[in-house]
Amino acid sequence: MLGSGFKAERLRVNLRLVINRLKLLEKKKTELAQKARKEIADYLAAGKDERARIRVEHIIREDYLVEAMEILELYCDLLLARFGLIQSMKELDSGLAESVSTLIWAAPRLQSEVAELKIVADQLCAKYSKEYGKLCRTNQIGTVNDRLMHKLSVEAPPKILVERYLIEIAKNYNVPYEPDSVVMAEAPVGVETDLIDVGFTDDVKKGGPGRGGGGGFTAPVGGPDGIVPMPMPMPMPSPNAPFAYPLPKGPSDFSGLPVGTYQAFPNIHPPQIPATPPSYESVDDINGDKTVSSAQIVGPKPEAPAKPPSRPVDNYNTFVLPELPSVPDTLPTASAGASTSASEDIDFDDLSRRFEELKKKT
């Protein structure tokens, strides 16, 4: 199945060009659609409802096209991420089958706006054979993305979708608008239709248990006239008894009494509290002899320390200071042999000599 005209580098470059081109087109078409919505609001304000409906179909087409471009951009990015598989494998990998077939299918439908997309499709056909490319263009192989085929189809959008667009545009621009009652009556009861029909209306209508992720919750079955009954309340658990910690395990018998009771010890009596406080010595008797009777001492009798020598007690009340000599008011006269020079008062050499003599003697 390996094609002879396949060039890997050319495919890689054009995939990147397709991604950039698609991004620019998406941005451009989104801005144009916003401006077109203002024109539709003007038509509604002027009472030109039919003209507004036709204009809305163009906007829906552009929105579909933008969504299709986003899908193709995603597939191109996927091929670039797995480009090593395209180069190394001769057969088509199953994880790339949808991406490759969708790009080949969309190339002839968008090559007028994205010319690089045709080059990408040709390279893929050269890689996986032209027969494979023919099957992809007609979707006989069945791997083309269904959502992309719906967005690029030539069918007219549903009338209910057109009315939804008109209602939203009138609401955004504060324009009065009365939707078509016939079209609104055809809408499914209880189903909120999106602005862009994604083809999930049948799934929503069918409903049924097990479709939601409610942790085992069963959806209520619809009643008559599309009225959905209120769901039954969830059963509340019965209140449990409060938690109680187990009692600590201990000896079954303790002095004949059960565990947890208290009784005073019969053989031990606390000391009696004296009725009057003990008397203390006065401060005046601090110098007196302090004797404590041996009966007041509890426990073994301590050894008596050596008695210090007694000294006469001083009587501070009769203490008299002795008379001190009077301070002389004249300086003593210098001796006759003393020299008045400060340098002759002390002879350091003589002192050093005497100090050395003392050291020798010792």
UniProtKB/Swiss-Prot annotation:
Residues 292-350 are annotated as: Disordered. Keywords: Cell cycle, Cell division, Cytoplasm, Cytoplasmic vesicle, Cytoskeleton, Nucleus, Phosphoprotein. Residues 302-311 have a biased composition (Pro residues). Residues 333-343 have a biased composition (Low complexity). It comes from the Eukaryota. One of its GO terms (molecular function) is MIT domain binding. Pfam families: Ist1. GO terms for biological process: collateral sprouting; midbody abscission; positive regulation of collateral sprouting; positive regulation of proteolysis; protein transport. It is found in: Cytoplasmic vesicle; Cytoplasm, Cytoskeleton, Microtubule organizing center, Centrosome; Midbody; Nucleus envelope. One of its GO terms (cellular component) is endoplasmic reticulum-Golgi intermediate compartment. The modification Phosphotyrosine is found at residue 43. Its main location: cytoplasm. The modification Phosphoserine is found at residue 4. Gene3D superfamilies: Vacuolar protein sorting-associated protein Ist1 (1.20.1260.60). ESCRT-III-like protein involved in cytokinesis, nuclear envelope reassembly and endosomal tubulation. Is required for efficient abscission during cytokinesis. Involved in recruiting VPS4A and/or VPS4B to the midbody of dividing cells. During late anaphase, involved in nuclear envelope reassembly and mitotic spindle disassembly together with the ESCRT-III complex: IST1 acts by mediating the recruitment of SPAST to the nuclear membrane, leading to microtubule severing. Recruited to the reforming nuclear envelope (NE) during anaphase by LEMD2. Interacts with CHMP1A, CHMP1B, VPS4A and VTA1. Interacts with SPAST, STAMBP, and USP8. May interact with VPS37B. May associate with the ESCRT-I complex. Interacts with MITD1, in competition with VSP4. Interacts with SPART (via MIT domain); leading to the recruitment of SPART to midbodies. Interacts with SPAST. Belongs to the IST1 family. This is IST1 homolog. The gene is Ist1.
